[in-house]
Amino acid sequence: MIIIGVVVVIIFILIVGWRSASQSRQKEAIRLATTTSTENSGLLEYILPEFIEKYNREVKVIAVGSGKAFQMGKDKEADVLLVHDRAGEDAFVEQGFGQGRYDVMYNDFVLVGPMDDGLIRQDEQRDILLGFKKIYQEEKAFISRGDDSGTHRKELRLWSAVEIEPESGNYISVGKGMGETLIMADEQLAYTLTDRASYLAMQEELDIGIVIENDALLFNPYGIIPVSAEGADWINQEGGQEFIDWICSDEIQEKIGQYGVEEFGQALFIPNHQ
């Protein structure tokens, strides 16, 4: 009987070990291609530990511009995209590269620049198109991200809306993320377009400030997209869907809405999954 008992215990241990190993294999990391704004703002650092602990699954964050994130999705180098270029997101899904798009949150863009040069009057602080016109007409320095990010794409659409092609020596395209672009604009006392979250997260380091905000044209929605696994069996569909369900859950939506309130007196992102 003792021998039988020992055998049963050994079998039980082997089964448990096999199941544990199997579960470990299933919990492969997911590759999240996302914008630099979600990283620069500190949002991902704030929410991701909860996902990792709950699901025992690592998240490999690749923070790039939205354009680069779309390309990574097309090349099957990411499992999930968290981006902020609605036109690009819709096209990505319509072309079959993504399996749907889900609202996650939004904030807005703001124009930042030197506060004391008098370019933008108080009654003009909600008119982004007028601001862009005046920057061009007065030959003020403007730093463009120039990286095909969601922010860069938004900036180009604003220039197009005022029928201006900014190619003068005062327009500097740097090919950098939001944080580096803000630092360069600050050093050169130049203007730049930024998402509000990135600016607020860095404002203590900057002398430039918000000169135009709260224009409806500056609305900035973020969407999450699972990358299609067609022709790419290495795409982590299970982990990707797990992440999407998690970030869209009531619990994490509430957490997103709390981020920044204590430090900045306002949420850096407004949850809007429905």
Model-flagged regions — what are they?
Residues M1-K54, G67, Q71, E77, ...:
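Exported/periplasmic ABC-transporter solute-binding proteins
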Residues V80-Y106:
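Acidic, polar ligand-binding/catalytic clefts
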Residues Y106-D108, E139:
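Residue-level signal for tight coil/turn positions that link beta-strands
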Residues L111:
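Serine endopeptidase catalytic core focused on the charge-relay Asp
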